[in-house]
Amino acid sequence: MALVPMVVEQTNRGERSYDIYSRLLKERIIFLSDEVNDATASLVVAQLLFLESEDPDKDIQLYINSPGGSITAGMAIYDTMNYIKPDVSTICIGMAASMGAFLLTAGQKGKRFALPNAEIMIHQPLGGTRGQAEDIRIHTERILKMRETLNKIIAERTGQPLEKVQKDTDRDFFMEAEEARAYGIIDEVITTAKK
């Protein structure tokens, strides 16, 4: 388990220490810096809902450095981002791959960013199943439907034709930050923090 730094603040009641992520949450900053799975999705969703309850009119920043992960867990984050009232700004640091890239596109249009050396990768969903032939057929139909849903959302969020997204996601499709801007996944490559 990684060591999480602590920060100490002086208040009128004395000193107060926070882990760094809790301190950043006070500034409405959420980090997704791991695989997207049920546990990380629950944490991100809880933080989004908490920040909405604190101030429904103030933007939330979601920093993404993720290799991707579970579609259903990612869709829980995606749906919550769209469900809550505050705009969610997305910022790619490092890499946003697969579901990480999908969530990067899900930020409020005009508020989707990447740092200059960030890397973005989109592709079709991965899956694997074993068992009886009928079960394999059921899972195959499900993953094909998920691929169709994801591609439609990416096309809508980026402004790319659906046919292009289908072709580009057929295999791993890597982009540098500027290429992701041209594609429509992000709106701007930034070198300094946006306030």
UniProtKB/Swiss-Prot annotation:
Coiled coil: none annotated. Keywords: Cytoplasm, Hydrolase, Protease, Serine protease. It is an enzyme of class 3 (hydrolase). It is found in: Cytoplasm. Its main location: cytoplasm. Gene3D superfamilies: 2-enoyl-CoA Hydratase, Chain A, domain 1. GO terms for cellular component: cytoplasm; endopeptidase Clp complex. GO terms for biological process: protein quality control for misfolded or incompletely synthesized proteins. It catalyses: Hydrolysis of proteins to small peptides in the presence of ATP and magnesium. alpha-casein is the usual test substrate. In the absence of ATP, only oligopeptides shorter than five residues are hydrolyzed (such as succinyl-Leu-Tyr-|-NHMec, and Leu-Tyr-Leu-|-Tyr-Trp, in which cleavage of the -Tyr-|-Leu- and -Tyr-|-Trp bonds also occurs). InterPro entries: ClpP (IPR001907), ClpP/crotonase-like_dom_sf (IPR029045), ClpP/TepA (IPR023562), ClpP_His_AS (IPR033135), ClpP_Ser_AS (IPR018215). Its EC number is 3.4.21.92. PANTHER family: ATP-DEPENDENT CLP PROTEASE PROTEOLYTIC SUBUNIT. Belongs to the peptidase S14 family. This is ATP-dependent Clp protease proteolytic subunit. The gene is clpP.
